[in-house]
């Protein structure tokens, strides 16, 4: 029976959008929200309100509802579950018909699902925990410009993680000194170097000058070592037009890879750039600057696994994922859950990793996970074990903080990486025997011995804020 508020012309959402008997279709887009309702609001009503506001609903009855098939287009909350260890919150599972979304548009999906409902008064807090994209939608998205295998073929690097470094200091260097730092790191043994997220085109270093000096450094290191090298040239800019101009110049210089800050620049810019990279044979490295503003609060926002899925659809060949062991936030199980979403063709539901739905990616190429942030040689065994071969391990301060300089720091990391990969291939337990593996390798590498001594006391032992809700 309708409530008094419904009689007064205000929607009782539960009557229309709470459908516990509904069985989701393979073509439905599924969402899991963590909901904390306002005091006095029943769970079913709060969940239905989320389904309504993120699909077809409005606050009152309108006569134009009669001009379309609301039963076909509405979002449906089909299940509610308790959140382990939190009596105030619950999970709301909502199914959305595919026709609510523009083909190939991550922008439209996010606008619908999180664009307005997060300010809704019926809920105290709201978090989008996971999405299940149907294959029918995935097939309309371009995805990564190259993918993992094509990147390995382009760079001729197989059987191990790639080794990288963010140039430090991230701001303040002249273009010439910046290029010199790139050259030393690549000559010393790194595969890739990187612009930091906030180096664009500042007065101390205009982008075109940086690109030219970096290209010279990459070409020189490639010629001297006989290995294919690269540097992520950050093309992020204030306008899409300027971004594309920078991308075109990187291509003219013969560089293999460019970089983009996908959250601060936006998904429209990112998809535009990814499509261009696909058409022009360029690799695309993605930085997640601003992600923690959105995903770190365990009760409100969007979990990073959702952002990672959206990035795979929008397009990128690398994505920063945290390190588990370094200075940045990252629960191990949860991190592995969204790393799987980046790389695998099919990811089964696994609540122990925060995966709420089976996700079939079809034939969409994978994205390399990038571990970066407060890591050094002592972390190498754990990083190789956690992230596996299809990853980029980036040591910024852990390369350039070496007492012997950038080239020595790069050499130390390269020796450590190859020692860990060799030990793993021999069946050794990297996380249990890692210290011994590194010390043995250091007997034949002065650079590694110095690095091990330099960073032997450095740890980041803060607890994770955003932990998995498991019983």
Curated annotation (Swiss-Prot):
InterPro entries: RuBisCO (IPR033966), RuBisCO_lsu_C (IPR000685), RuBisCO_lsu_C_sf (IPR036376), RuBisCO_lsu_fd_N (IPR017443), RuBisCO_lsu_N_sf (IPR036422), RuBisCO_lsuI (IPR020888). It is found in: Carboxysome. One of its GO terms (biological process) is reductive pentose-phosphate cycle. Encoded in a cso-type operon. The lineage of its organism: Bacteria, Pseudomonadati, Pseudomonadota, Gammaproteobacteria, Thiotrichales. PANTHER family: RIBULOSE BISPHOSPHATE CARBOXYLASE, RIBULOSE BISPHOSPHATE CARBOXYLASE LARGE CHAIN. The gene is cbbL2. The keyword Amino-acid biosynthesis does not apply. This is Ribulose bisphosphate carboxylase large chain 2. Heterohexadecamer of 8 large chains and 8 small chains. Forms a CsoS2-CsoS1-RuBisCO complex. Binds 1 Mg(2+) ion per subunit.
């Amino acid at each position: 029976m309708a409530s008094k508020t419904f009689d007064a012309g205000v929607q009782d959402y539960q009557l229309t959008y709470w459908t516990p008997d509904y069985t989701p279709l393979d073509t439905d887009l599924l969402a899991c929200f963590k909901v904390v309702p306002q005091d006095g609001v029943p769970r079913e009503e709060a969940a239905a309100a989320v389904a309504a506001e993120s699909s077809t609903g409005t606050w009152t009855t309108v006569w134009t509802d009669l001009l379309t098939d609301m039963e076909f287009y509405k979002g449906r909350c089909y299940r509610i579950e308790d959140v382990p260890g939190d009596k105030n919150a619950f999970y709301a599972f909502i199914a959305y018909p595919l026709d609510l979304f523009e083909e190939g548009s991550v922008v439209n999906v996010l606008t619908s699902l999180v664009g307005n409902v997060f300010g809704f008064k019926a809920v105290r807090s709201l978090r989008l925990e996971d999405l299940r994209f149907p294959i029918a939608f995935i097939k309309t998205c371009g995805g990564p410009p190259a993918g993992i295998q094509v990147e390995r073929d382009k760079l001729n690097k197989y059987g191990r993680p790639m080794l990288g470094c963010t140039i430090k200091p991230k701001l303040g260097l002249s273009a010439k000194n910046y290029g010199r730092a790139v050259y030393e790191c690549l000559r010393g043994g790194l595969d890739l170097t990187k612009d930091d997220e906030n180096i664009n085109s500042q007065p101390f270093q205009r982008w075109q000058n940086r690109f030219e000096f970096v290209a010279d450094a990459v070409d020189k290191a490639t010629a001297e070592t006989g290995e294919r090298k690269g540097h992520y040239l950050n093309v992020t800019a204030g306008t899409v037009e300027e971004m594309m101009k920078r991308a075109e110049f990187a291509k003219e210089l013969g560089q293999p890879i460019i970089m983009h800050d996908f959250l601060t620049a936006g998904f429209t810019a990112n998809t535009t750039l990814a499509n261009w990279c696909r058409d022009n044979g360029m690799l695309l490295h993605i930085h997640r600057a601003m992600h923690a503003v959105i995903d770190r609060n365990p009760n409100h926002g969007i979990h990073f696994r959702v952002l990672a899925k959206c990035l795979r659809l929008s397009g990128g060949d690398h994505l920063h994922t945290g390190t588990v062991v370094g200075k940045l936030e990252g629960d191990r199980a949860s991190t592995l859950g969204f790393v799987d979403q980046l790389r695998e063709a099919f990811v089964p539901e696994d609540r122990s990793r925060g995966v709420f739905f089976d996700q079939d990616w079809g034939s969409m190429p994978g994205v390399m996970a990038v571990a970066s942030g407060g890591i050094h040689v002592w972390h190498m065994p754990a990083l190789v074990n956690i992230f596996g071969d299809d990853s980029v391990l980036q040591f910024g301060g852990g390369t350039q903080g070496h007492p012997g300089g950038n080239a020595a720091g790069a050499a130390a990391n390269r020796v450590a990486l190859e020692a860990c990969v060799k030990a793993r291939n021999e069946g050794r337990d990297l996380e249990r025997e890692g210290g011994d593996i590194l010390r043995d390798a250091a007997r034949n590498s002065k650079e590694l011995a110095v690095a091990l001594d330099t960073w032997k006391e450095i740890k980041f032992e803060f607890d994770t804020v955003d932990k998995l809700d498991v019983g």
